[in-house]
Structures are given as structure tokens and as C-alpha cells.
């Protein structure tokens, strides 16, 4: 097929407003998601210039990064956090933006509540002043993070100047074995191509293992596209996508729904379309994963050992490994199942959806959090929290000794009151294990919700495929 296009190319082409020769094209933005951290300066810029919002009906705001997961009271916030959430509330009032504040039943992490409200739709361009905006690509949307100056530009014009990215296909063939989740799939991918293997690309995830995932699982995979350096991650929409979106608040209704689905079905990579790069993995080879170092690419299977830098031929990589081991406080050759933890965090925009909490609850039910371990569970949104409580998951966690919290970004990043102390070692379902990410001197191991819950009750990492 001469004019065969990839999924990304189709969405890109449909959104070009103008493409002057020698300049970056201008693309249209369908949805703009806003939170309290990266928006204040953008709104201030509009006020100084006397500009209005170009499309307030396509702008959605929430409070998530700085909010307390212990109390919905403003008094629970630090002075800086309180200033940020109050500033967002005032800006939304001044500019007519829909806001899901800390008292709204649908408030939550921006990348959790957006999809569950039907704001995220196939074939759209979605931006947010947040690096994990790629999450929304699970629906066949082109979604990526932007900086504060770009936030202001989108608020004012509903457009962005963007250079077209290269295309990469990551195909995960076959089916995973028991105990292997979407988190393990994406960690295995990053382990294979590295934390910069996707730089300059928009990645399309495909293959039987991806198609078999729920929308929650696909969101987990696309969420971490940025952790392999990619601009965005995408999965072609299919019946799983349509079933998830049907009836959601901002999804099309009636005849509009029928027309939308017909259009969405065409948003897929054509036979014969050529990618700039192709990566293949066999799902059957993927075991439960966990990181050992200080970036998501420093990852091994649970039945493996901490790698030895001496076996690395590349001097730069070897030095990076040595530095990571020094910070993380591990010795080469240590079995991963011998690593003890004292903190567990189940939450974040990567793994705080209902499927994630159900998976974790399986390993918490009838057990107790190990002595000396503090474990918290933070639902990704008010909707997730309500559903989990309706299913009795909160009781399972509480009876096992986990703390059950309010929605928010929480311990993913040391920007609120949920943070690690120096020397703490945490099994975390978040997306980044950089030095100090969860608190100064903190040591983070990225895992799936099931692996995190199992570590909480065992006091160390375990292979959830085996009795423990």
C-alpha cells in the first residue's frame, strides 16, 4: 500500500493546522489537562497579556500533586501546597475552567480521572504540563507532556508548534504467564531498549500481549513510554477501548457515539506501513520485574540477581551501574528475593486504578504487613476509591495492616507529605526510581501492585509465581 500510514501518522496528519515550509508545524489540541503545579505561571501570563482562554470547554483541571492523602482539608497542606491549590481554584474561576478540586467526588490524579471521565478519546491530541501524559495514548490518542510556557500557549490558542517524531513499533508477541502484569511488560521493554532507547520516537505498542491487556493495563504501559525516552506511547483502539468508554460522562452519546466508533475503528496502522524502528519481545519470556538501580532501565527479573558492573563492557554504562549500586545500597550478585524493604507504596498514575488495587488485594487478603514495614494504598481517584470500597478492597487492606488513603499523586514524588526518609527502601508501583525521587536519600524499587503487596507481607521481595 503506497500511502500506508501508522497510527501516529494518522492522528498527526488529522491535527495539522498549518505547516509553513522550514518551520515546525502547528497542530490542534483537542484536550488540555491542567493541575496545580505547572499552571500558575501560565495563567499569570494570560492575565498580564489580557488574553482569554481559546477553548475553556476543552480544558480540564484537577488538584493532585500537592494534595494530602490523609485529609481533604486545606489546613492539611503545607503553605506552598495550599497556595498552589488555591491559586488553581482562583484561576479556574477567573477563566471559566472546569475544576475537580479536593472536595469533588471525581477528583484524582490527572491521568486517572481523565480517562475514567471519558475526556480521553481515540484519535485526539491531548497535552498536560506533566511528563506522564503519555498514559492517554492507551486509547489511541497522541498524548504528551508540555512545559509551562507551552501550557500558556495552548490555553491561549488551543494549538502547539511541534516537530514530527520518528515512529517505533514495539511488538510483544504471544501471551504472558501467570503473575506477569502490564507493569512487568513495560519494565521488561525498558530493560531491553534502555531509558533512552525511545528518544525521538512516538512508540506504538502492539502484539497479542498488548491486545490482551485491559485499558488499565494499556495505560500502565503507555504511562512509562516516557521512561524509555519516547515522546509518546500509543495503542490502537479496539473493542476493549470502546467498551471502556461507552457511557462515560464526556464520551459521545447516541448517534454521535455510533459515528465516533466508526471513525475510531479506522485509527489503526495500515498493513504495509513502515516504522523507523522495530523492537520485538516474546511475552512468555517475561517474568515479574523489579528495578535494582536508579533508573527504570536498571531492571531484572525477580528470579535474577543484582548485576555486576564488572561484566559491562561499556565504560559509561559500567560507571552508571557502579554509581547506582552505591546509592541504592546493594551488592552485585545479591538475589533479588533477598532484598528487604521497610516501605511499600501502591498508587501513582502508573498503578492506582481499580484493576491494580484488586491485584494487590489478592496478596494482602488474609495476611498481615510484616513487622517493621509501613505500607500505604492510594487510589488514583475518587471514583476508584468509591469502587474499591464498594468491593470491600479497603477492608482487605486495612485488616492486613495497610493504610488506606485519599486520592492523589502521594509518594510517587517528594512534593507532598507522603515521602520516604533517607535510607528507606521502598517497593513502589510508581514510574521513577531516580535518586531522591521519593525523598532525599530514598531507595526505590519499581514493581507491579501484586509484587508490592507481596513484599509488604513478606518483608522482602518474593516471586509471586511461587508460594511464599
Swiss-Prot record:
InterPro entries, per the entry: 3-IsopropMal_deHydase_lsu, Acnase/IPM_dHydase_lsu_aba_1/3, Acoase/IPM_deHydtase_lsu_aba, Aconitase_4Fe-4S_BS, Aconitase_4Fe-4S_dom, IPM_dehydratase_rel_enz, IPMI_cat
First-tier enzyme category under EC: lyase
Entry keyword Nucleotide-binding: no
Keyword 4Fe-4S: yes
EC number, as in UniProt: 4.2.1.33
A Pfam family hit: Aconitase
Alphabetical list of SUPFAM superfamilies matching this protein: Aconitase iron-sulfur domain
GO terms, biological process: L-leucine biosynthetic process
Positions bound to [4Fe-4S] cluster: 349, 409, 412
Cofactor(s) needed: [4Fe-4S] cluster
Pathway note: Amino-acid biosynthesis; L-leucine biosynthesis; L-leucine from 3-methyl-2-oxobutanoate: step 2/4
Purpose of the protein: Catalyzes the isomerization between 2-isopropylmalate and 3-isopropylmalate, via the formation of 2-isopropylmaleate.
HAMAP family: LeuC_type1 (MF_01026)
Subunit structure: Heterodimer of LeuC and LeuD.
Protein name: 3-isopropylmalate dehydratase large subunit
Species the sequence originates in: Shewanella baltica (strain OS223)
